[in-house]
Amino acid sequence: MYCDIIMVQDKLEFRKYRFMKEEILHITDGDYFNNYFTKKIGGFAVPFREVIMDGEVVDIVYSDEFIKLRAKTLNVSENEYRSKMSVCEILSKNIYSTIYLWFGKDTFCQMNLLALLVYLEQIKYQGKLILNYIDDVTFEQIESNIDVKLGVYKKIYRDVLISKYKPKELGVLEARAVDLYFDYHSNNGMLATLIKNNANKSKSELLSLLIEASKDYGMSDLQAERLINFYLTIS
């Protein structure tokens, strides 16, 4: 009888452990780190796949209008864009008591993080949110276990990404990343000036120069190439 009780308790503890494990979700800043995370750290992790720093957005994240606009910006079909929305699908179930966010501090990651936080506000996520800032090159943690309080990010999203204005309140977001977002889109910004001043160089030389200068922006090679083509065309 005693053994039976112990076995029942063990089963209950095991089920409790499984339930607790299933309640935790990790959201990463892209496929590259996500693959590293699942192999080296472990746990259920999904990547947030977007390039919010490019193009425009609308008020409601992942609305039909948002998807249509973002698909056009990223030059993919709406179906292809939807196929990359694993975060949206998982979060819409709203079953996780704790979500860990793993993002970098560069502009690319910060604008994506902003959109994600707004989506969490939209679905009225009530669980615990913990942010870990990472180095996107070494994957080392820069800052850990930052408690994130929702409720302020919708306004920040509207101010920064729609009205193109830097508010005083930024929550957990990095002020420098927001500044560089505006610089990235400025015809007189650091990157635009760099391209214009080196227009006589070959495209490969200019690309290397731009990538080296834009580490804090977090730009991809493709983004850098688009930026070069844009400013060389209008210069």
Q: How would you describe each model-predicted region?
A:
Residues 75-91:
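Glycine-rich, highly charged phosphate/nucleotide-binding loops
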Residues 21-23, 96-98, 126:
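A general structural motif
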Residues 47-52, 126-139, 221-225:
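A generic structural motif
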Residues 110-168:
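Long, charge-dense
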Residues 192-194, 212-235:
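Charge-enriched amphipathic alpha-helical scaffolds
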Residues 142-210:
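A conserved mid-domain beta-alpha-beta active-site/ligand-binding segment of alpha/beta enzyme cores
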Residues 2-80:
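A structured, charge-rich N-terminal accessory region that forms the first stable segment of a protein
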Residues 27, 98-108:
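Acidic beta-strand-to-loop metal/phosphate-binding motif
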